[in-house]
Amino acid sequence: MQYHLQVEPHRCAHRTFPSPMTDAVVASEYLDESAKWENFKLDPRLLQAVYQLGFEKPTLIQSNAIPLSLEDKRDIIAKASTGSGKTGAYSIPIIQNILSEGLSEHNIKSVILVPTKELANQVTKFIEKLLVYCNSITQINLATNVSDQVVVSLLSAKPEIIISTPSRLTTVLEKHASIVDLTTVTSLAIDEVDLMLSYGYMEDLQKLDDFLPIKRNLQTYLMSATVNDDVNDLKARFCTKPAIIKLNDNEENQNRLVQFYARTSEFDKFLFAYVIFKLHLIKGKTLAFVNNIDRGYRLKLFLEQFGVRCCILNSELPVNSRLHIVDEFNKNVYNLLIASDESTEVTEQEGEDDQEDSKPEKSKKKKGKKVDGEYGVSRGVDFRNVACVLNFDLPTTSRSYVHRVGRTARAGKAGMALSFVVPVKEVGKHKTATNPGAKRDEKVLARIVKSQSKNGFEIKPYQFDMTQVEGFRYRAEDAFRAVTSAAIREARIRELKNEIMNSEKLKRFFEENPQDLASLRHDKELHPAKVQSQLKRVPDYLLPESARQDPKKIGFVPFHKNKVHKNRKRKGGKKVDALKSFRQKK
């Protein structure tokens, strides 16, 4: 028998509170004001760590999931938006159960699976803070880039908690089955379940059947922002009589997120981006998504010619660099982050069009360079205080769109999403600016509008005032011509070399000198082949009248230079010889 629970968020004024989940904030409607942490009978050490993290009240998901898992020993399937406390809903009971069982000897007690290395790092950091007073419990993050020798050494110590991606864990188990014993595991948590399936981890999850005590002495947590039919396979495989908890917060998200789309030509994407960021039309931080790595560098090289600083996040960069970029973005070091969303999510629910359209893209991926298959930015990564999500390139599926725009309007804050859509008649007219996936933009937009309307969201068309924008076109064209394929290739090589050096050679130094880490920046100019410094200044005549400088405050500017100054420059005379003019005093 399954236990279903529908949870409604509070309809109250928005307040935000520190969250131990990610050191971010939790909106007040997600808090359960009637619950207290003491009601869960947590270990004093764990309770003290929770309070030290600044979380005074459990969230609705936590107040329902934690008692069911600790007292009733139920498997948990939870559906709730990002920022509602899902990470704490499974990590707190996992640690509590380990403490309750006692630690007479070290054994692997819990396995936490996440889809990306970035999310694995976030979960590791959070659990590390929960264990601040529980030094006897150890954890290991297998998703980091460490050698097999180091992994074997760490696993031989039998850490109580293992955090990993499914593929990394199965690889380690197959290579070192004699060292890693998972028969003692009592808790299994799978975070971002729907993304696990989209990333193709189903085969790896099936392999875990041979190593985990499935349905014998295993308590399972399946956590996701969306729960659909695809989750049924995992539910049947890992769960026994699960309690299903759903947080109905669509109305709250609808009030906070404003969505727009703008139909534009392929080159005008760059023109609009120049105007938006150079004139600071968006207040706050922006997360811009492109569909491949080259597009990200082309946009960065284009914008930096106008003095617009930004950094890039893609699968080519070392893991340590990616994690540092996310941390610095969350600390407001950068206001613009260009992220390459290279994942292609294709499911039966998207329909035949999605499957047909995505086949060529998949084949191209296989022929391309090897990239990190466990990289992901559109989902799961904790981007904080994002004011705007800019879909510079429209995603290939409506589900990918939902994941992208979910990076803003979080934790009770308002947000805006703007998507550039290329009409079919405009595709291919500007070869250099062409995005291969643009030919599907109209179809994808129709599916996005349809899926969003089902959930009560509206995507409004946005029309740029071209009379204000046209004046910037010739400058944009000049800058765009400087961004050649050779310039992009050189920029990728230069950036990769810099980041590898930062990631590998300086890793140990920064561990010993964390204060010096702040000096490491990722938004340095890469420079195209042709540098045009004059483009960094916007002439006054290009600005709207409201933004122009008042002529009365400029003062008098003569047409000719002052003649006095000219004459002074020409004057000079003969220099006095000090030896000839020297007179001895009598």
Curated annotation (Swiss-Prot):
UniProt-listed Enzyme Commission number(s): 3.6.4.13
Known function: ATP-binding RNA helicase involved in the biogenesis of 60S ribosomal subunits and is required for the normal formation of 25S and 5.8S rRNAs.
Principal location listed in the UniProt entry: nucleus
Residue ranges of the region described as Disordered: 344-372, 562-586
Name used for this protein in its record: ATP-dependent RNA helicase DBP9
Motif DEAD box: where in chain: 191-194
Catalytic activity field: ATP + H2O = ADP + phosphate + H(+)
GO biological process entries: maturation of LSU-rRNA from tricistronic rRNA transcript (SSU-rRNA, 5.8S rRNA, LSU-rRNA)
CDD domains xref list: DEADc_DDX56, SF2_C_DEAD
Organism: Meyerozyma guilliermondii (strain ATCC 6260 / CBS 566 / DSM 6381 / JCM 1539 / NBRC 10279 / NRRL Y-324) (Yeast)
Comp. bias (Basic residues): 562-573
PANTHER family to which the protein is assigned, alphabetical: ATP-DEPENDENT RNA HELICASE RHLE-RELATED, DEAD-BOX HELICASE 56
Residue ranges of every copy of the Helicase C-terminal domain listed in the record: 274-467
Key words of the record: ATP-binding, Helicase, Hydrolase, Nucleotide-binding, Nucleus, Ribosome biogenesis, RNA-binding, rRNA processing
Upper taxonomic lineage: Eukaryota, Fungi, Dikarya, Ascomycota, Saccharomycotina
Residues noted as binding ATP in the record, renumbered to the chain: 80-87
